[in-house]
């Protein structure tokens, strides 16, 4: 390890240690100024898995808030008081970082078109890896240069019946097994 990078690494570790000590992994002011530079070195597959985890986490938080607001019991709080209580109990336990406008903007983003969010989450459940499952979709790095493809008469566009079997994409190229496994 080079001396310069070792010093920089030590500085970053000390900063991380201070963040862990104060137990403040994020604050509400980070919602609109999030720095995602730490993601730049990760592969597309890792980024895709992080996206899946983030969407599942958002769904769980939205479900917790909806469950609390729809359950029977004492709901004497209303307006800002209710928002602060729900935020502290179900989202993040540091009220000093509570910012009503930013929190409303965050929830508005997820609640404006909840049908689209539910559809996205259902596809994410399909893509999520399971133990001993062949269902996980392999993510490939994008090709840097376009290559000219030779026309192969054995390749054809999938029929509507074949396309309906594929839940993710409706445009599929069907490759006969004779092309994949020549005798």
Curated annotation (Swiss-Prot):
Give the highest taxon in the source lineage. Answer: Eukaryota
Q: What else is known?
A: The sequences of the gene BABR proteins are nearly identical, differing only at their carboxyl ends.
Name-wise, this protein is Gene BABR protein 2
Q: Which organism is it from?
A: Babesia bovis
């Amino acid at each position: 390890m080079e001396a310069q990078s070792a010093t920089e690494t030590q500085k970053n570790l000390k900063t991380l240690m201070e963040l862990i000590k104060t137990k403040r992994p994020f604050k509400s002011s980070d919602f609109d100024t999030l720095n995602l530079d730490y993601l730049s070195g990760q592969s597309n597959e890792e980024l895709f898995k992080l996206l899946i985890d983030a969407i599942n986490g958002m769904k769980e938080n939205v479900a917790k808030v909806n469950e609390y607001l729809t359950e029977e019991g004492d709901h004497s709080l209303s307006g800002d008081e209710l928002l602060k209580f729900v935020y502290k109990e179900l989202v993040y336990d540091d009220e000093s970082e509570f910012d009503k406008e930013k929190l409303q903007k965050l929830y508005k983003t997820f609640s404006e078109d909840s049908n689209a969010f539910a559809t996205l989450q259902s596809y994410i459940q399909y893509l999520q890896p399971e133990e001993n499952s062949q269902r996980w979709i392999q993510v490939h790095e994008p090709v840097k240069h376009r290559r000219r493809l030779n026309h192969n008469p054995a390749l054809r566009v999938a029929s509507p019946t074949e396309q309906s079997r594929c839940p993710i994409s409706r445009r599929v190229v069907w490759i006969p097994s004779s092309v994949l496994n020549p005798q």
